[in-house]
């Protein structure tokens, strides 16, 4: 979004061209680089800069619910773009997705992904160093994965509806400050 305070304008979007083809937004879409199914539903999208990237490049990572559904386009055939599930609870896998976005080239590409327990709604993903913490909200689980996408530990909660988000923070020098 450009001019966020004076008159916001959407400068570009990441989305499936086929979904947006009959709208005025299609010209705003970045080009998908590579062969992968675009995210279907997404939660906790995180913008990440990196000193190794060129100006105009950044990462976006997210919990990809892997669901094809839209209240504004109930007739859209999501299976035509690889999203075969439209149920909040009956899917097999959701995914952790990480894109490299290049504003200069007008592209986005999938640079990392792995399957996680399915959750059609809610949920979260957080990079913690080399690891990734994933909350599959409708399953009531959260798992920390190592750099090779192997589960380190999984927790399951008794819950009535779902776990909305899970985050991991260090509180060094915050609550437990050393006193001299």
Segments and roles (model prediction):
Residues 1-180:
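Histidine-/acidic-rich catalytic cores in large beta-rich domains
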């Amino acid at each position: 979004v450009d001019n966020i305070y004076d008159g916001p304008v959407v400068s570009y979007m990441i989305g499936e061209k086929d979904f947006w083809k009959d709208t005025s937004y299609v010209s705003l879409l970045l080009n998908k680089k590579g062969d992968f199914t675009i995210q279907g539903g997404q939660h906790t999208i995180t913008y990440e800069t990196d000193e190794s990237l060129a100006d105009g490049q950044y990462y976006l990572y997210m919990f990809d619910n892997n669901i094809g559904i839209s209240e504004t386009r109930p007739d859209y055939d999501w299976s035509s773009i690889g999203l075969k599930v439209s149920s909040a609870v009956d899917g097999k896998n959701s995914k952790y997705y990480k894109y490299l976005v290049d504003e200069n080239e007008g592209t986005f590409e999938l640079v990392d992904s792995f399957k996680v327990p399915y959750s059609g709604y809610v949920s979260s993903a957080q990079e913690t160093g080399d690891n990734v913490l994933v909350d599959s909200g409708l399953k009531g689980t959260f798992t920390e994965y190592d750099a090779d996408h192997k589960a380190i530990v999984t927790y399951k909660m008794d819950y009535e509806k779902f776990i909305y988000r899970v985050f991991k923070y260090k509180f060094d020098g915050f609550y437990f400050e050393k006193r001299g």
